[in-house]
Amino acid sequence: MRVLTGGVSPSSSSFEFVPLSVVSFGSTVIAEGCDAATSISWIHAWTVANGIITQVREYSNTSLTVTRIGNVVAGRRSAEIAPPSHCSSVWESQFSGRAGKPVPGLVLAI
């Protein structure tokens, strides 16, 4: 929990979250940023239901692509899965390569 809150113990150095972008796709909210020295990039993906965060995912020094799978009609997901050729990328991280080193890439399907 220390990483998510930015809280620190007396024996560790502090970490300052610097958010650079926040976007939402339906019930998923993505926040991306880095530390104050821009040496560590981070991405938080929150799932929100009825105004309450119900799930949190945290990625550090990782490139993330958010892809929509399935059809959304009138704000509701249909049970039908879209063919792979119709899976569209709706967001890609921008700041994961700032540290000048290669990072792993992940796909978050929503």
From Swiss-Prot:
The species this protein was found in: Arabidopsis thaliana (Mouse-ear cress)
GO biological-process terms attached to the record: leaf senescence; response to fungus; response to molecule of fungal origin; response to nematode; response to ozone
Name of the protein in question: Senescence associated gene 20
InterPro entries: NTF2-like_dom_sf, Wound-induced_1/12_sub, Wun1-like
Coiled coil location: none
Regulation: induction: Accumulates in leaves during senescence. Induced reversibly 4 days after exposure to ozone O(3). Triggered transiently by Nep1, a fungal protein that causes necrosis. Expressed in nematode-induced giant cells (e.g. M.javanica) at early stages, 3 days after infection.
Classification of source organism: Eukaryota, Viridiplantae, Streptophyta, Embryophyta, Tracheophyta
Gene that encodes the chain: SAG20
SUPFAM superfamilies: NTF2-like
